[in-house]
Amino acid sequence: MKKKNNHFMNTLKSFGSALLVIAILIAAYGIYHAPTSDASQLKAELEQNERELAKEEATPANPPENTPAGTTAATHSAATGVPDISQSSISVIGDSVFLGAAPAFKKLYKNAVIDAKVSRQVVQALDIVKNMDKKGKLGDTVIIALGTNGNFNSATGQKLIDYLGPDRTIYWIDAYGRNLPVQRDVNNTIRRVAKANNNVHVIAWSKEGPKHPDWFYQDGIHLNITGQKKFAKFVRKNMITE
């Protein structure tokens, strides 16, 4: 009888172990399959967007539409104290977050010049804007969409703003990621730089992003198709109402 009980208990243990292994395999599939799928789709999107932006970079910059001769956003702002985005040439310096949203933003501002790359950091931005300026592609309105990939100090940010000058309207989109370690430090630095410069305005993506987890891919940083469109509209809304 004892042997039968032992056999029964061993059978239960074996069955329980098998169920545990199956449960672990199912959980592992759920954890790893979705992010891999997301990563593949995101990679394809970013590569496609980079190719499209590279084509545009090879062509001369278009002047902003419906802009009266001799009128720029800078002169309008100086006269009224309010940036006029409708009469502005827009340039964007961004990382992979903005690269993903580039097509959606171009639908809102088709003449915007976007220079966005994967893994880009703020410390690289000064050389980028100098190159854009040399090519005549640095607009009256500049959007800085950097900070996700690493911290920087106020001096680095100020050098960038100094080069862009006081006559440009500058929007700096702050950083957000569901588990982004540098977010707090980066955003504090962005706000310090903005506070020191009247023409720099912060677009608080870090406050809007957390409200919409369904806009993001699995990594909680990059945006899916829906999120890209919403992000572009959020940026536009903040540029208009700033």
Would you name each region that the model predicts?
Residues 187-242:
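Catalytic His-Asp segment of secreted/periplasmic serine-dependent ester chemistry enzymes
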Residues 87-88, 110-112, 137-142, 165-171, ...:
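Loop/turn elements at helix/coil->beta-strand transitions in domains of secreted/extracellular proteins
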Residues 2-89, 135-138, 236, 242:
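N-terminal secretory targeting modules
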Residues 150-153, 161-162, 170-172:
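Internal catalytic-core helix/loop-beta-alpha segment
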Residues 83-156, 177-184:
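Conserved SGNH/GDSL esterase-like catalytic core that processes O-acyl groups on lipids
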Residues 93, 115-117, 173, 203-208:
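Conserved beta-strand termini and adjacent loop/short-helix elements that scaffold enzyme active sites
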Residues 15-22, 40, 175-206:
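Substrate-gating cap/lid alpha-helix
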Residues 91, 99, 103, 107, ...:
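Solvent-exposed, polar/charged alpha-helical surfaces in well-ordered, non-transmembrane soluble domains
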